[in-house]
């Protein structure tokens, strides 16, 4: 069975789109790493409700606290907004290169296509009063895989054009007008997709889709609904939805707000109206090691991986991952769309939630009902949310240990897949 899986994974890794996707994700790693470090510092240190600021009162003794925080959060949002355009750029570049076309021209064209698609007001809104066009958006919520697919389409346009069509200048530095063809077709694609998005937004198509998908998580059983929402959120991260990496507020969970009101008014967490909330189970324990228990995978890779690259990425990603921002790690390995890690990625958070649900049912620990500061390390979320319960902290550590044990067999499977890829590469070189 294991050998069959390895052969299937090897076959999948040889597909062109998979190779392009993995190259793109790995290329995004340094940008995500820098953005992640800046984001963690801005939220945890330079935010009024930040975890480090609450501990050391940074805002009281640092004169430049507010301006530094504003600069850092703006820079982080800017880099985060570039995730979509950069994904499309690298995907277009690597697709064109995969088929022997000009990588530079395809990459820049893909970048322009991404900016046009993501700026719905660009083609429909007038210029500002001063004549400045300021309608280009860098959305903070994108699906990385969709952005990669758009770049892949642009790369295919360059692929099916003639080789001479993507040369801007020849060897004598003379401009070649034929390069207009693939660029023009790519821009037509961008405008068409932009118009479709505008029409879909005006017709409430996307709102209808969101309502439809939400019905899968609504059941009469509150505990089951919480598990379903946690599973859907985790799977959404695995397919590249970067919105799930945004810090969650207790204000977004109406049941958690009811619990908080009850705890404050009754001075106890006993007899809460909603014991199994998304905040109490998923955010506190399902994400005790980050989205998909990424921190546990990071530790498992450091312990069991034979890949120097994976260990290096893991070490570089430790800081943001500790503070519940695992996006750099997920693109650097990559974990996104990696079938080897799909099962543990989905399973580990569900196991954590199961452990927490049982512990709450037998009153082994109190419920996490209190607000948690921004940028709090994921391992301490339940500890702070329960008002400092050592039993909740012990359960959190237990969940992390269980997650590491879940991931280790899959890390060893990944070692075998990478070894197989290396052997195939060496055999091709000797032919």
Predicted regions and their residues:
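Signature of multi-pass transmembrane helix bundles
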Residues: 1-50, 63-64, 68-238, 242, ...
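Juxtamembrane inter-helical linkers in multi-pass membrane proteins
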Residues: 2-7, 56-60, 167-179, 254-270, ...
